[in-house]
Amino acid sequence: MQLTLFCFVCLLPGHLALPLSQEAGDVSAHQWEQAQNYLRKFYPHDSKTKKVNSLVDNLKEMQKFFGLPMTGKLSPYIMEIMQKPRCGVPDVAEYSLMPNSPKWHSRIVTYRIVSYTSDLPRIVVDQIVKKALRMWSMQIPLNFKRVSWGTADIIIGFARRDHGDSFPFDGPGNTLGHAFAPGPGLGGDAHFDKDEYWTDGEDAGVNFLFAATHEFGHSLGLSHSSVPGTVMYPTYQRDYSEDFSLTKDDIAGIQKLYGKRNTL
């Protein structure tokens, strides 16, 4: 099967940039080059027809997703959105399921943590992973079981640069992590960039609990939401409180896939 990858990312390396055009608006040539790569990555086709769009149409798709006037022109504010750390899946409206709605069919999904960050004690990473998975399992008839060796449905780890899955990390900033849709092999696995500064709720660095909860949403089969403030919103904010929870939109999406958990 074809694997679907999702990741937190800020900017992508530029290539094949077009000459500065009218659509560039009030931005520099370098920013226009960055914007082209961003649009090709996150808005490659029309959300309804699935046809490949021009860059102008891609930009309008982005503006529509974020509730902005669909001018088809860049602005400093749009560039600001593009430069926020985020997950690397193309954007869609409200909650969305991945193509073909992949999901886990067993009621017990195993996970294994194979590598750690030096920023947090291992026991803290273990606790955060457990807490992030529990946020989802509290809403659906699915349970997670940790294994210490051998194979597991979801392999979780921290890695640098090229780490064997054809999606290398890029050092501090930009890409923060990525996860694969449910399935065999790499399916469901969640990787985090070891070069980031991972924290347990500090102001600086990346809040690992929030990032893990977001990525595990992808590991379960969710795509992105256009609703600001949701866990599955594509851009990463640094002001999430430690007592955040899944929103109604997040819950609606995951229950669309798995149904509601019986609390009786």
From Swiss-Prot:
<dbReference type="GO" id="GO:0050830">
    <property type="term" value="P:defense response to Gram-positive bacterium"/>
</dbReference>
<dbReference type="InterPro" id="IPR001818">
    <property type="entry name" value="Pept_M10_metallopeptidase"/>
</dbReference>
<comment type="function">
    <text>May play a role in tissue reorganization.</text>
</comment>
<keyword id="KW-0865">Zymogen</keyword>
<dbReference type="InterPro" id="IPR021190">
    <property type="entry name" value="Pept_M10A"/>
</dbReference>
<feature type="binding site">
    <location>
        <position position="193"/>
    </location>
    <ligand>
        <name>Ca(2+) 2</name>
    </ligand>
</feature>
<feature type="binding site">
    <location>
        <position position="171"/>
    </location>
    <ligand>
        <name>Ca(2+) 2</name>
    </ligand>
</feature>
<dbReference type="GO" id="GO:0042742">
    <property type="term" value="P:defense response to bacterium"/>
</dbReference>
<keyword id="KW-0106">Calcium</keyword>
<keyword id="KW-0272">Extracellular matrix</keyword>
<dbReference type="InterPro" id="IPR002477">
    <property type="entry name" value="Peptidoglycan-bd-like"/>
</dbReference>
<feature type="short sequence motif" description="Cysteine switch">
    <location>
        <begin position="85"/>
        <end position="92"/>
    </location>
</feature>
<feature type="binding site">
    <location>
        <position position="185"/>
    </location>
    <ligand>
        <name>Ca(2+) 1</name>
    </ligand>
</feature>
<dbReference type="GO" id="GO:0005576">
    <property type="term" value="C:extracellular region"/>
</dbReference>
<keyword id="KW-0482">Metalloprotease</keyword>
<keyword id="KW-0378">Hydrolase</keyword>
<keyword id="KW-0732">Signal</keyword>
<feature type="binding site">
    <location>
        <position position="175"/>
    </location>
    <ligand>
        <name>Ca(2+) 2</name>
    </ligand>
</feature>
<dbReference type="GO" id="GO:0008233">
    <property type="term" value="F:peptidase activity"/>
</dbReference>
<dbReference type="InterPro" id="IPR024079">
    <property type="entry name" value="MetalloPept_cat_dom_sf"/>
</dbReference>
<comment type="similarity">
    <text>Belongs to the peptidase M10A family.</text>
</comment>
<dbReference type="GO" id="GO:0031293">
    <property type="term" value="P:membrane protein intracellular domain proteolysis"/>
</dbReference>
<dbReference type="InterPro" id="IPR036365">
    <property type="entry name" value="PGBD-like_sf"/>
</dbReference>
<dbReference type="GO" id="GO:0030574">
    <property type="term" value="P:collagen catabolic process"/>
</dbReference>
<feature type="binding site" description="in inhibited form">
    <location>
        <position position="87"/>
    </location>
    <ligand>
        <name>Zn(2+) 2</name>
    </ligand>
</feature>
<feature type="binding site">
    <location>
        <position position="189"/>
    </location>
    <ligand>
        <name>Ca(2+) 1</name>
    </ligand>
</feature>
<feature type="propeptide" description="Activation peptide">
    <location>
        <begin position="18"/>
        <end position="94"/>
    </location>
</feature>
<dbReference type="GO" id="GO:0042127">
    <property type="term" value="P:regulation of cell population proliferation"/>
</dbReference>
<dbReference type="GO" id="GO:0002780">
    <property type="term" value="P:antibacterial peptide biosynthetic process"/>
</dbReference>
<feature type="binding site">
    <location>
        <position position="173"/>
    </location>
    <ligand>
        <name>Ca(2+) 2</name>
    </ligand>
</feature>
<comment type="function">
    <text>Degrades casein, gelatins of types I, III, IV, and V, and fibronectin. Activates procollagenase.</text>
</comment>
<feature type="signal peptide">
    <location>
        <begin position="1"/>
        <end position="17"/>
    </location>
</feature>
<feature type="binding site">
    <location>
        <position position="187"/>
    </location>
    <ligand>
        <name>Ca(2+) 1</name>
    </ligand>
</feature>
<dbReference type="GO" id="GO:0050829">
    <property type="term" value="P:defense response to Gram-negative bacterium"/>
</dbReference>
<feature type="binding site">
    <location>
        <position position="163"/>
    </location>
    <ligand>
        <name>Zn(2+) 1</name>
    </ligand>
</feature>
<keyword id="KW-0645">Protease</keyword>
<dbReference type="InterPro" id="IPR033739">
    <property type="entry name" value="M10A_MMP"/>
</dbReference>
<dbReference type="InterPro" id="IPR006026">
    <property type="entry name" value="Peptidase_Metallo"/>
</dbReference>
<keyword id="KW-0177">Collagen degradation</keyword>
<feature type="binding site">
    <location>
        <position position="214"/>
    </location>
    <ligand>
        <name>Zn(2+) 2</name>
    </ligand>
</feature>
<feature type="binding site">
    <location>
        <position position="165"/>
    </location>
    <ligand>
        <name>Zn(2+) 1</name>
    </ligand>
</feature>
<dbReference type="Pfam" id="PF00413">
    <property type="entry name" value="Peptidase_M10"/>
</dbReference>
